C-alpha cells in the first residue's frame, strides 16, 4: 500500500485457457492497427519527446525558465500520472503531488518578467516524475499514451483543479 492509502492502478492481463472448441475461434484476430497501437513509440519519437521534457526542465533550472515552460512541466506531471493510471508506472502517488506543488510554488515566485527558476529542492521533487515519464515514453504502448493525452486534454478544457487524487495532496 502506498502513502495515503492509494495504490496505482496496475493492469494485469488474465489469460484464460480455452479449449479447441468453436468458442476459441469466435473472437476476431486483432487487426494490424490494433497491434500497432499496442506497441511502444518508435525510439526516435520517444527520444524527441523525452528530450523536450529534459530541455524544458534544464531551462527552468537556470534563468531561462518562464511560467510557460514550468506550466509545460506541470502538464508532463499530469500526463505521467495519467499514463500510470493506464497501468504503466509505479511512482508513489504522493510524489506526483510533491512535484505539482513544487512547480506551482515556482510559478508563484515569478515576478512581472515571468522568469521562473526551479530551486534545487524543487528539482529533487520533479526528477522522479521526469524519470518515470522517460520510462513510459519508451515502454508504454501508444494506446496508453493516447488515452493519457485525451484525459489531459479533457482536464485542461474542463477543470482548474488538480487531477491528482485528493488523498495524495
Regions flagged by a language model, labelled:
Residues 57-72, 111-127:
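Short, low-complexity cationic-aromatic patches
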Residues 2-38:
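Short Lys/Arg-rich cationic patches that frequently serve as NLS/NoLS or arginine-rich RNA/DNA-binding motifs
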Residues 73-105, 135-149:
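Extended intrinsically disordered, low-complexity coil regions enriched in Ser, Thr, Gly, Ala
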Residues 38-41, 88-92, 111-116:
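A ubiquitous short alpha-helical element
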Residues 116-169:
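Amphipathic alpha-helical binding modules
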Residues 7, 11, 54-56, 62, ...:
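Short intrinsically disordered, low-complexity segments
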Residues 25-86:
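Short terminal alpha-helical segments
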